[in-house]
Amino acid sequence: MRSDIVKKGIEKAPHRSLFKAMGYTDEELERPLIGVANSKSEIIPGHIHLDKLTEAVKAGIRMAGGTPIEFGAIGVCDGIAMGHTGMKYSLATRELIADSCEAMSKAHSFDGMVFIPNCDKIVPGMLMAAARINIPSIVISGGPMLSLNRDGKQLDLNSLFEAVGSYKAGTMTKEEVDDIEDHACPGCGSCSGMFTANSMNCLTEVLGMGLTGNGTIPAVYAERIRLAKYAGMKIMELVEKDIKPSDILTNEAFENALTVDMALGCSTNSVLHLPAIANELGIEINLDIINEISSRTPNLCKLAPAGKYHIQDLYSAGGVQAVMSELAKKDLLHLDLVTATGKTIRENIQNAKVKDYEIVKSIDTPYSATGGIAVLRGNIAPDGAVVKKSAVAEKMLIHTGPARVFDSEDEAITAIYSGQINKGDVVIIRYEGPKGGPGMREMLSPTSAIAGMGLDSDVALITDGRFSGASRGASIGHVSPEAMEGGPIALVQEGDIVDIDIPAGRINIQVTNEEMVKRKESWKAPKPKITTGYLGRYARLVTSASTGAVLK
């Protein structure tokens, strides 16, 4: 056993004494030691209940003959961090989570790992750690929050962000906003749409690192607790067979994840995180690969924010496996890959089927012939930008309008709420990239303000920052190179005419090459906003969004 290095032989008597100081018995130490990374906290609704799942996981480990050893992991609530300095830390914590889980596992020589995340950066951070550590591992997520029906409308957190915009526009009363506030988030779980957390939980299942149902079983269902027990039992099988993440997370597995990503219409953050996870294994996922997979993958789902359905509806319609079964009908997936279930994907989806074709479209009658995410390139974004095209109003798929330029999210929000943005405008928010932010903040507040004020079908937003999975409209992010590195987005001037053609994959400003060169010659990089502490270090080490914003 890997753990023998901390428990076997006379030389390890001091080590065993320390274990015994915590109550471990000789019998427990003779079994495989399984690290359990519990990210429970009292600041994230998606994590408030993870102590219950952790106990279920540990019960499963014990039932299968192992000894669970729990430790804590950090996590940021993106919703609470949204729209202020706190959001600068969100993406940066992905690396902290990966590093700290690596340190705990390596320092104590665990035989296997169970990772218990749920929300935005915790899921990819733990998957990065699993790939890096490369010992038998499994992920059991906390599950999605339920969406509550209120006055005939399904509510979610995004309903409230947009309600603030509606209130500012004078189309909603304070009492109406208060009512949504009290009911939009009815309990524990990751926010209920196909936002970033649920996107990554679903893709964890597709990658093969989670059990069937990991992405869609609601947080409050007893089935989620049973799944956690099975995950605890399953890790012992993976340890016995020495099935490691590198056996599961192959190039083909990432192609599957991107394919299902496009079919589900996942958050654009998924194409930031999947390359980062793959990078841990020496696998390259670039925007060209993403674009190629999107071009051949039909979009089968329009879940919130793209449509009215939520993750609980996807669960009722057959879950992720049902979507995979549809894709398999057109040979769009690699089916003979090993997964954490101990079975192949082909075996996992053998009995899966769509139970409601209103929620999951047939492969023969998709919402669109191409995927939910599109990659754009042009003289604003020569290295690429991404947009969740499944959440873009049809009239905005092709758009031309004047640039309204802001050098921070805060400036843009002030302008939007004060009525300075008009129909047809293209809002440019720059110096919010991985280095410039630093931390590549999510722009949910400005996109929700635009939507809440009734402008989401008339105004586009382009940024070198990112978007929440809850953002909708012509929200084009991850513009690379970013402004802080002298990317062309730094050269856009107020009033420049911007051409957006999402179907053609193009994004340009109507400015000559000669003028762009002239502007670049006079451009000077602004002073870094933060130079000390973790964010100062992060800004110096982080790479482009086009390669996953990993640290080098």
Curated annotation (Swiss-Prot):
Gene3D superfamilies, A to Z: IlvD/EDD C-terminal domain-like
Assigned EC number: 4.2.1.9
Residues bearing the modification N6-carboxylysine: 121
MF terms (GO), sorted A to Z: 2 iron, 2 sulfur cluster binding; dihydroxy-acid dehydratase activity; magnesium ion binding
Binding site for [2Fe-2S] cluster: 119, 191
Binding site for Mg(2+): 78, 120-121, 442
Catalytic activity line of the entry: (2R)-2,3-dihydroxy-3-methylbutanoate = 3-methyl-2-oxobutanoate + H2O; (2R,3R)-2,3-dihydroxy-3-methylpentanoate = (S)-3-methyl-2-oxopentanoate + H2O
Active site: 468 (proton acceptor)
Function: Functions in the biosynthesis of branched-chain amino acids. Catalyzes the dehydration of (2R,3R)-2,3-dihydroxy-3-methylpentanoate (2,3-dihydroxy-3-methylvalerate) into 2-oxo-3-methylpentanoate (2-oxo-3-methylvalerate) and of (2R)-2,3-dihydroxy-3-methylbutanoate (2,3-dihydroxyisovalerate) into 2-oxo-3-methylbutanoate (2-oxoisovalerate), the penultimate precursor to L-isoleucine and L-valine, respectively.
Subunit structure: Homodimer.
Record protein name field: Dihydroxy-acid dehydratase
Gene name of the record: ilvD
